[in-house]
C-alpha cells in the first residue's frame, strides 16, 4: 500500500494539473470566440460568392476557362490537408489525418499518384511517415493566419493544375458545426464541382443578370479567387474546430482530475485510518504486555 506521503503528493500533483487544464480550457474558449467571429463575418461573403460563381459557371461552357475543364486522364491528385500546429485537442487531428489518408487510399487504389499540401505541423508529421509525397508544408501558420496564406496555397495548386501536374485537388478540413461537433470534410476544389456552386448555379444562368464585360472575362477573374476563398473558408473552419476540440478535451481532462482526486482522497483516508488503527493496536498490545 502506498504511503500517506506518496498519496498526498499525487493529490497535490493532480490538483496542479487541473489548474493547467482549466486555464487551457479558458484560453481555448476565448480563442474559439475570436475564430467564430472571423468565420461568421466571412460566411456571408463566401455564400454570395459561391452563388454568383455557380450562376456564371452554369451558364458557360467548361472550355471558357481551364479551371473548369476536367482533364482527360486523371493521373495525379493533390490533397490540401489542414490540421493544427499543437496537440492537446483530443482526436481532432487524428480525424483530419484519417480522412485525408482515406481519400488518398481511394485514389491510389484507382492507380493515381497522390501529393499532399500540409497546413499545420501535426498533419505534416503524420504524412511524412507514409509513402505519400509532401509538396509543401506550412508549419506554424495555423496559429496566426490570414487570407494571404490561403492565396499562397491556392496559387500553388492552381499553377500545378494548369501545368497538368495535378488533375484533381481536394481540401480536407474540420467542418465547424458547433462546439460539440467538428467532423472532417473532404471537398473537391479543382476542377470546380457542381457541389461548390450555389443553388442558382445548379439551375442555369440567371437571366435577370447582365454580366459585363462578359461571362468569360468574369470567370477568368473569379475562378482563381474561388479556389482561394474555398481554402480560406477551410482554414477558418479548421481553426474553429481546433479550439472547440481543445476546449472539450481540457474540460474532459479537468473532470478526470476531479475523479482521480476523489479516488486518491478516499485512498488517503483509508491509508491514514489503517495507520492510526495499527498505532492503536501497538499501544493496546504494549499496555496489555505491561499488565501481564
UniProtKB/Swiss-Prot annotation:
An example of a Gene Ontology cellular component annotation for this protein is: proton-transporting ATP synthase complex
- How does it sit in the bilayer? Peripheral membrane protein
The record's annotation in InterPro entries points to: ATP_synth_F1_ATPase_gsu, ATP_synth_F1_gsu
Molecular function GO terms recorded: ATP binding; proton-transporting ATP synthase activity, rotational mechanism
Q: Which GO terms describe its biological process?
A: proton motive force-driven plasma membrane ATP synthesis
Is Disulfide bond among the key words of this record?
no
The alphabetical list of record keywords is: ATP synthesis, Cell inner membrane, Cell membrane, CF(1), Hydrogen ion transport, Ion transport, Membrane, Transport
Q: Name one Pfam family in it.
A: ATP-synt
Main subcellular localization, coarse class?
membrane
Q: Where, per UniProt, does this protein localize?
A: Cell inner membrane
Q: Which HAMAP family match?
A: ATP_synth_gamma_bact
Q: Which NCBIfam families match?
A: ATPsyn_F1gamma, PRK13424.1
Its biological purpose is as follows: Produces ATP from ADP in the presence of a proton gradient across the membrane. The gamma chain is believed to be important in regulating ATPase activity and the flow of protons through the CF(0) complex.
The record describes its quaternary structure and partners as: F-type ATPases have 2 components, CF(1) - the catalytic core - and CF(0) - the membrane proton channel. CF(1) has five subunits: alpha(3), beta(3), gamma(1), delta(1), epsilon(1). CF(0) has three main subunits: a, b and c.
Family assignment?
Answer: Belongs to the ATPase gamma chain family.
Q: What is this protein called?
A: ATP synthase gamma chain
Its source organism is Maridesulfovibrio salexigens (strain ATCC 14822 / DSM 2638 / NCIMB 8403 / VKM B-1763)
Amino acid at each position: 500500500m502506498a504511503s500517506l506521503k506518496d498519496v498526498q503528493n499525487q493529490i497535490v500533483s493532480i490538483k496542479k494539473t487541473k489548474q493547467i487544464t482549466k486555464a487551457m480550457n479558458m484560453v481555448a474558449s476565448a480563442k474559439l470566440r475570436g475564430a467564430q467571429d472571423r468565420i461568421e463575418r466571412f460566411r456571408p461573403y463566401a455564400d454570395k460568392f459561391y452563388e454568383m460563381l455557380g450562376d456564371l459557371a452554369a451558364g458557360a461552357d467548361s472550355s471558357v476557362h481551364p479551371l473548369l475543364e476536367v482533364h482527360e486522364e486523371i493521373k495525379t491528385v493533390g490533397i490540401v490537408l489542414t490540421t493544427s500546429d499543437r496537440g492537446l485537442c483530443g482526436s481532432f487531428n487524428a480525424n483530419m489525418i484519417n480522412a485525408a489518408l482515406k481519400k488518398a487510399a481511394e485514389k491510389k487504389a484507382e492507380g493515381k499518384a497522390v501529393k499532399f499540401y500540409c497546413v499545420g505541423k501535426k498533419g505534416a508529421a503524420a504524412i511524412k511517415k507514409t509513402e505519400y509525397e509532401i509538396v509543401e508544408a506550412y508549419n506554424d501558420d495555423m496559429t496566426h493566419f490570414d487570407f494571404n496564406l490561403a492565396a499562397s496555397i491556392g496559387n500553388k495548386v492552381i499553377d500545378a493544375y494548369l501545368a497538368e501536374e495535378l488533375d484533381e485537388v481536394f481540401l480536407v478540413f474540420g467542418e465547424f458545426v458547433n462546439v460539440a461537433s467538428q467532423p472532417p470534410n473532404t471537398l473537391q476544389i479543382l476542377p470546380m464541382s457542381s457541389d461548390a456552386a450555389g443553388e442558382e448555379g445548379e439551375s442555369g444562368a440567371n437571366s435577370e443578370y447582365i454580366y459585363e464585360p462578359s461571362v468569360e472575362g468574369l470567370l477568368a477573374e473569379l475562378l482563381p479567387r474561388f479556389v482561394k476563398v474555398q481554402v480560406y473558408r477551410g482554414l477558418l473552419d479548421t481553426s474553429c474546430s481546433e479550439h472547440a476540440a481543445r476546449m472539450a478535451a481540457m474540460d474532459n481532462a479537468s473532470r478526470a482530475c476531479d475523479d482521480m482526486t476523489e479516488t486518491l482522497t478516499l485512498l488517503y483516508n483509508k491509508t491514514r485510518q489503517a495507520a492510526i488503527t495499527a498505532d492503536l493496536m501497538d499501544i493496546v498490545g504494549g499496555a496489555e504486555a505491561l499488565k501481564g
